[in-house]
Amino acid sequence: MGQKIHPYGFRLGVTKNWRSRWVAPFEKYPEYIVQDEKIRTLINKHYGHAGISSVEIERLGNKMRVIIWTARPGMIIGKQGAEIERLREEIVKLLKNDYEVRIAIYEVKNPETDAQIVSDSIARQIERRVSYKRAMKQAISRAMRSGAQGIKIAVSGRLGGAEIARREWFVQGKLPLSTLKSDVDYGYSIAVTKYGTIGVKCWIYKGDVEDLQELLPPRGLERAERRPERHANA
């Protein structure tokens, strides 16, 4: 069987950026990772209906910046910023007042081509007993109309209440999963039904990143440029 790597992790540092950006002493790493996971769980629990694409967390000393990418920023900000202030207070309480927390909200301009938002939408429809085939086909159609070059959606579990779990998928366009320069977005969601849980996976190909050099860290570029000079001097 072919072994499949996570599409996001495969491209970290190439076409994708880390969603947790901080440096910590060795003994603090487990604590920071658990805190990040609790923050993401809190946000998705309260604002999952707002079309959350991703939650990025930055730390510097005792300061923390939480960046939320969402399709409906107004639902998180609230009237006169009331909701976002309540969320900030909950995060501060979760962290036991150890951090000065700031929250930044960014709008996802094209949610039809955001894999996490698409998979969440399909999962919610399955929970409302909408036909999974209909939900998948509609999502594929919207994504292709919105500029995606390829899309694959897979669902697995007791589909339609069947006794035996199975896996089904639909594919349209091209999906170069093994090419590092290809911009492939990936999302995963779980639909909770009375028959059990159904997993929803979504891959969306948005085209190639033309200039990879701009995405590489400066230090790596400097080392790459100096290497031929060392050989020449030798």
From Swiss-Prot:
GO terms for cellular component: cytosolic small ribosomal subunit. It comes from the Bacteria. This is Small ribosomal subunit protein uS3. Binds the lower part of the 30S subunit head. Binds mRNA in the 70S ribosome, positioning it for translation. It comes from Coprothermobacter proteolyticus (strain ATCC 35245 / DSM 5265 / OCM 4 / BT). Gene3D superfamilies: 3.30.300.20, Ribosomal protein S3, C-terminal domain (3.30.1140.32). The keyword rRNA-binding applies. GO terms for biological process: translation. The gene is rpsC. Keywords: Ribonucleoprotein, Ribosomal protein, RNA-binding, rRNA-binding. Residues 39-109 form the KH type-2 domain. Part of the 30S ribosomal subunit. Forms a tight complex with proteins S10 and S14. Belongs to the universal ribosomal protein uS3 family. GO terms for molecular function: mRNA binding; rRNA binding; structural constituent of ribosome.
